[in-house]
């Protein structure tokens, strides 16, 4: 029972809500049915909307109910009957994955989505994903999601909604489809009373080899209005206490939620036609037919439901006129009035064809004659499956009638439903509401033609006795003497009513409209500060959906590489609003530019590079702003100019392939059809160029928002070759724990691109030089383009290009060769027995199952079959490199080799300078692993390296080579590295099942976006180098990064000695560093360290033993939640056959005492140190070996004594 004080509190709260005009809603948190999954947060934490196919809405206003699948499936369940089901999944970065390589939310392989995998059955299969029960969708409810599928062999995708006994098909498609950036689905559910469920199904044939995936489901404006104690001024108060805007009364939709806004008592003076029983007062001239969806669908573009009943059994009008023929519907005659507006609300449907057109005319009756029709509305194109609401207010001094004209394009349909005349639309006296007669002319075409000098085909422009075809309109080249063919092609100051050809194609509550500045209020003047001036302004529209406003140009192109759009814009909005420019090509949108966070309200000049594009493409302004929000929110565009777009105009820089990017980008320009782009940037922060360290370079960040798509292109203008061979040299930068692939290719007209060079994964935080020989066909008509492509098969890191140079003649031999793209100029000798191959099919010549570079069957290597039938015993097969330049100092030539299990013979390495000298000889049985070989090279003249395979006469034997590299400095001992010249024999190992992240290589002095030690251990300065890994990129899920040694021979006892560094803030969860021994018997963790550590280098010694060949693996991982900080390694030393020696404690600098507590703490630490040493001495007497020790590096304050002791199994270590 509620006490008087309780009643008083409730009364006070109720009165406060009354006085403030705010929502007053009882708390329904404990109601399991009525207040759950209805798109309204009844609980303060919105817990009543959890697991409803979405999660509770954000506290930020105007945000949708969303499920991005990052936490869980949000209640979506698989109800498929076959063995293949929808699952919440996450992709790796591997290109051989059947599903998407990234999600849509994050755009990386760390994100989650719902997917159904490969179907290998003999019959077509349908997989269905169903939502939980949802309740009460508003008429404005819109479901948006992103989908991905392999378009080659998926039969159909469907989105259905089931309520009561009826299932509505909201959307269905048989393609085409594309990757994440290309396909967003937005469907309007319409008003749904009571409970309903949504299902997404994919039907695939028996040969489908790819995955179907869904991500980022959003429910926009689905909740019914909540009861209000008092409505804003002018709003209608519904019977259920909800509030709706005045224009929502009698509009044919249940906006209140209880249909009181459509009460016949309120709407009795409106003339509404829903076509359920006929045409009402409207008259069909030709082309329209009344129909419904159930059992009548003649194509997928046919309306699946009407608007009035939101049912497949509801009636509507649809145009059945042949393409090119206009269907006309006209109203009865209404009285004219200058004192009020006659409002006409209507719903139309345009779907299936870009050639669909709909127009609304008003035809007035003068004193003696009927006046020509006046066009009030015109829409064309593909608007999706929604019924779009619009409204016109007609004020006429003379009687008038309304004409509705529709023309369908190929495969498309135009529909009409719910034609509603307001109470101010009064019939002419004596005119029946059931029928009327048409007097006067009607439009026989949607676009009435003026008199022309010459008849041209449809779509052609007549000028100067010419018929300009569509592909030459807006191609940035003037064909007409007066330039009529380029008049409405995007360039405009909006002073002309044609608006430069920009056309609003919005379907929601916002629209683009040419407006006069002094009337718009936001802003009050145009760009030229003229109050009477015009600009393209974002305004309110009569649509019911909260969709973006869109304005589109006519078809443009082709354009040249220097094509730019210049404009001024105004943008002021809350954080959820945006203003953007996109390019539409072949149904896909590429985001070119987005306005930064809300400006101060003034006009801003902006230049946007469009670049070289093929015909046809269109430009589109897209914006979403809450015009009713606080402040002067709004968006506007003015003075749009397309400059330097003629593709036939060339400049001197177009032939400049050599470029340091200091002045401009020379002949290089960015490619398109992806939201990821190369940018010419100036050195700043962690990004620096190669030329000066402070200049410009080309930069690609695969995570740079809104980067999406498979990759980014950087290519030259077409070039004319002048010599048969040229050498292209360039500097590249690949850095990051999971950076993708950088490729170089040559493109010739009419031919497939030829891959010339590629690198994958991190190459350390430094610039590397590479060169490639270009082979040309010297024919006058043969031109070529060079193109770099940065592939987004990795998402953490950056790519850079700088200092391109082209010279006549061939290049020197490459310093690095992975054989992924070519044979790198290696010559197989007279017999040609060395071949480049991979084992992807499993049916190729004899050789390793996987390569060393990628660790996959798709990777390439060089191999020679040493079987006696091809290479008799004692015979040799040589593989010779191109010439290397003279060496100014000693260098290390390293390579990875693979010998077949049975002894294939001897692999010898020679260096050919003025004479030929043998540097290395390898023989014996092989195995299943790639092994590292290395030789020290000194050469004062040009030299070559020769690999020679001498056969032993064993059947089914081979020798293989991969990853040949030349680095400055002498070669390191096996398992050892000071990291001053690179990673030595240590390399990235893929983490099982998830691809992997790479350890990186850097110095403290080199700028980097990732935290790392400020100095190394080897030299103790910022110029020294080390290996490191940034743990923050791992994310949850137990992933790790592995750095593995070369295979090491079996050992009874050996000592591993290294220095490590951890830099984790104390308030973060910590990462872990582990040492694993990996062999064919499995993996064994022999040491680990985690937790917060002070930023310092610590020493570790571990004694290891193994009865078979093994690898040492350093694993960087997380103990739980994501950590923020680096783990680093330096001075790794593997002492084969030696016991570890107790390290001498380092003498760090002694800090002067600053306070009594510090002195007391120091004494206590000294006591603990002596106690620890005494304990160690006692352990020594007990004959227990010290298997692992830590010590602090010289030059660092060792405030805490750090020691780790690991007791290893006897199978791994042995007592001294």
From Swiss-Prot:
Positions of the MAM domain: 62-224, 268-427, 492-647, 654-813, 812-973, 972-1142
Entry-listed glycosylation sites: 205, 291, 341, 368, 639, 839
Domain LDL-receptor class A: 27-54, 229-269, 454-491
GO BP field: protein transport
Endpoints of the signal sequence: 1-21
GO cellular component: endosome; membrane
Tissues where the protein occurs: Apical endosomal tubules of developing rat intestinal epithelial cells.
Disulfide bonds: 231-243, 238-256, 250-267, 456-467, 463-480, 474-489
Cellular location(s): Membrane
UniProt keyword annotations, A-Z: Disulfide bond, Glycoprotein, Membrane, Protein transport, Repeat, Signal, Transmembrane, Transmembrane helix, Transport
TM regions (residue ranges): 1156-1176
Segments on the Cytoplasmic side according to the record's topology features: 1177-1216
Topology term for the membrane: Single-pass type I membrane protein
A matching Pfam family: MAM
Chain's role: Probably involved in the sorting and selective transport of receptors and ligands across polarized epithelia.
The protein, known as: Apical endosomal glycoprotein
Gene: Mamdc4
């Amino acid at each position: 029972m509620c006490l008087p004080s309780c009643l008083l509190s409730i009364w006070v709260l109720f009165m406060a809500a009354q006085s403030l005009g705010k929502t007053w809603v009882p708390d329904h948190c404990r109601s399991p049915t009525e207040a759950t999954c209805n798109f309204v947060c009844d609980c303060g934490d919105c817990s009543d909307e959890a697991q409803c196919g979405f999660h509770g809405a954000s506290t930020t206003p105007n945000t949708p109910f969303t499920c991005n699948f990052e936490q869980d499936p949000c209640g979506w369940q698989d109800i498929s009957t076959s063995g293949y089901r929808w699952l919440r999944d996450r992709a790796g970065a591997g290109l051989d994955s059947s599903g998407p390589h990234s999600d849509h939310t994050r755009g990386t392989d760390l994100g989650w989505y719902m997917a159904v995998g490969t179907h290998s059955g003999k019959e077509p299969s349908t997989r269905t994903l169903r939502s939980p029960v949802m309740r009460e969708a508003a008429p404005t409810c819109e479901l948006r999601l992103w989908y991905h599928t392999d378009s080659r062999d998926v039969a159909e995708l469907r989105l259905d909604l089931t309520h009561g006994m009826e299932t509505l098909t909201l959307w269905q498609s048989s393609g085409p489809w594309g990757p994440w950036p290309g396909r967003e689905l937005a469907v309007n559910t319409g008003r749904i009373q009571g409970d309903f469920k949504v299902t997404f199904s994919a039907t695939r044939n028996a040969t489908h080899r790819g995955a179907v995936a869904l991500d980022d489901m959003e429910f926009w404006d689905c909740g019914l209005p909540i009861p209000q104690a008092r409505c804003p001024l002018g709003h209608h108060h519904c019977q259920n206490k909800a509030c709706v805007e005045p224009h929502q009364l009698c509009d044919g939709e249940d906006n209140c939620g209880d249909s009181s806004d459509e009460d016949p008592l309120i709407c009795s003076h409106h003339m509404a036609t829903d076509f359920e029983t006929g045409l009402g007062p409207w008259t069909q001239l030709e082309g329209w037919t009344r129909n419904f969806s159930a059992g009548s669908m003649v194509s997928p573009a046919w309306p699946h439901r009407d608007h009035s009943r939101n049912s497949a059994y509801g009636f509507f009008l649809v145009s059945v006129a042949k393409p090119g023929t206009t269907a006309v519907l006209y109203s009865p005659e209404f009285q004219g009035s200058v004192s009020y507006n006659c409002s006409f609300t209507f719903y139309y449907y345009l779907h299936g064809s870009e050639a669909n057109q709909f127009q609304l005319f008003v035809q007035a009756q003068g004193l003696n004659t009927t006046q020509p029709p006046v066009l009030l509305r015109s829409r064309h194109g593909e608007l999706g499956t929604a019924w779009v609401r619009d409204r016109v207010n007609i004020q006429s001094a003379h009687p008038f009638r309304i004409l509705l004209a529709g023309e369908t394009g190929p495969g498309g349909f135009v529909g009409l439903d719910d034609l509603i005349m307001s109470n101010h639309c009064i019939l002419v006296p004596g005119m029946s509401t059931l029928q009327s007669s048409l007097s006067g002319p009607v439009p026989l075409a949607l676009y009435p033609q003026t008199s022309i000098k010459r008849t041209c085909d449809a779509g052609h422009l007549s000028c100067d006795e010419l018929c300009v075809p569509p592909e030459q309109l807006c191609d940035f080249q003037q064909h007409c003497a007066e330039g009529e063919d380029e008049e409405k092609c995007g360039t405009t100051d909006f002073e002309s009513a044609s608006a430069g050809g920009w056309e609003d194609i919005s379907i929601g509550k916002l629209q683009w409209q040419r407006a006069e500045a002094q009337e718009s209020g936001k802003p009050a003047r145009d760009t030229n500060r003229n109050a009477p001036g015009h600009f393209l302004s974002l305004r309110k529209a009569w649509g019911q959906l909260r969709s973006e406003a869109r304005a589109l140009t006519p078809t443009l192109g082709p354009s040249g590489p220097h094509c730019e759009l210049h404009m001024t814009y105004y943008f002021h909005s809350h954080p959820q609003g945006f203003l953007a420019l996109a390019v539409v090509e072949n149904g896909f949108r590429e985001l070119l530019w987005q306005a930064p966070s809300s400006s101060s309200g003034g006009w801003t000049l902006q230049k946007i590079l469009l670049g070289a594009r093929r015909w046809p493409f269109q430009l589109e302004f897209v914006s979403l702003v809450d015009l009713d929000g606080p402040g002067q929110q709004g968006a506007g565009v003015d003075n749009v100019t397309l400059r330097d777009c003629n593709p036939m105009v060339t400049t001197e820089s177009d032939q400049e392939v050599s470029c340091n990017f200091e002045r401009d980008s020379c002949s290089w320009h960015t490619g398109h059809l992806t939201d990821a782009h190369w940018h010419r940037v100036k050195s700043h922060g962690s990004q620096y160029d190669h030329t000066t360290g402070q200049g410009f370079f080309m930069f690609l960040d695969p995570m740079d928002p809104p980067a999406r798509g498979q990759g980014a292109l950087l290519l030259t203008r077409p070039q004319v070759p002048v010599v048969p061979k040229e050498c292209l040299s360039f500097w590249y930068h690949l850095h990051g724990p999971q950076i993708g692939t950088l490729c170089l290719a040559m493109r010739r007209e009419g031919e497939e691109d030829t891959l010339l060079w590629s690198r994958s994964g991190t190459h350390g935080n430094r610039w590397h030089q590479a060169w490639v020989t270009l082979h040309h066909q010297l024919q006058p008509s043969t031109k070529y383009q060079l193109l770099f492509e940065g592939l987004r098969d990795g998402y953490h890191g950056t790519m850079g290009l700088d200092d391109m140079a082209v010279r006549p003649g061939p290049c020197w031999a490459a310093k690095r060769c992975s054989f992924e793209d070519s044979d790198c100029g290696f010559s197989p000798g007279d017999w040609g027995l060395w071949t480049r191959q991979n084992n992807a099919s499993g049916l190729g010549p004899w050789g390793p199952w996987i390569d060393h570079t990628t660790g996959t069957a798709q990777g390439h290597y060089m191999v020679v079959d040493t079987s006696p039938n091809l290479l008799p015993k004692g015979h040799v097969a040589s593989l010779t490199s191109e010439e290397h330049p003279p060496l100014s100092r000693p260098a290390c030539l390293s390579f990875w080799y693979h010998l077949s299990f049975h002894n294939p013979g001897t692999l010898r390495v020679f260096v050919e300078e003025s004479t030929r000298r043998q540097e290395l000889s390898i023989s014996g049985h092989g195995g299943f692993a790639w092994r590292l070989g290395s030789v020290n090279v000194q050469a004062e003249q040009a030299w070559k390296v020769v690999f020679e395979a001498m056969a032993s006469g064993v059947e089914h034997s081979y020798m293989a080579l991969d990853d040949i590299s030349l680095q400055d400095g002498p070669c390191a001992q096996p398992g050892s590295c000071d990291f001053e010249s690179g990673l030595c024999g240590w390399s990235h190992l893929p983490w099982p099942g998830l691809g992997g992240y790479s350890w990186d290589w850097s110095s403290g002095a080199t700028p980097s976006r990732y935290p790392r030690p400020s100095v190394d251990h080897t030299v103790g300065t910022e110029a020294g180098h080390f290996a490191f890994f940034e743990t923050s990129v791992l994310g949850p899920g137990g992933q790790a990064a592995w750095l593995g040694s070369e295979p090491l021979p079996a050992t009874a006892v050996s000592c591993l000695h290294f220095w490590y560094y951890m830099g984790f803030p104390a308030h973060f969860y910590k990462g872990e560093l582990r040492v694993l021994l990996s062999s064919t018997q499995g993996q064994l963790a022999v040491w680990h360290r985690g937790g917060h550590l002070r930023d310092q280098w610590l020493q570790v010694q571990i004694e290891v033993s193994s009865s078979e060949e093994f690898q040492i693996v350093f694993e960087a991982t997380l103990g739980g939640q994501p950590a923020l900080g680096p783990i680093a390694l330096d001075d790794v030393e593997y002492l084969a056959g030696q016991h570890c020696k107790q390290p001498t404690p380092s003498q760090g600098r002694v800090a002067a005492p600053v306070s009594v507590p510090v002195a007391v703490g120091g004494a206590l630490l000294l006591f603990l140190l002596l106690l620890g040493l005494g304990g160690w001495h006692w352990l020594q007497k007990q004959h227990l070996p010290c298997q692992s020790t830590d010590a602090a590096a010289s030059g660092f304050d060792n405030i805490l004594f750090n020691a780790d002791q690991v007791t290893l199994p006897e199978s791994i270590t042995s007592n001294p």
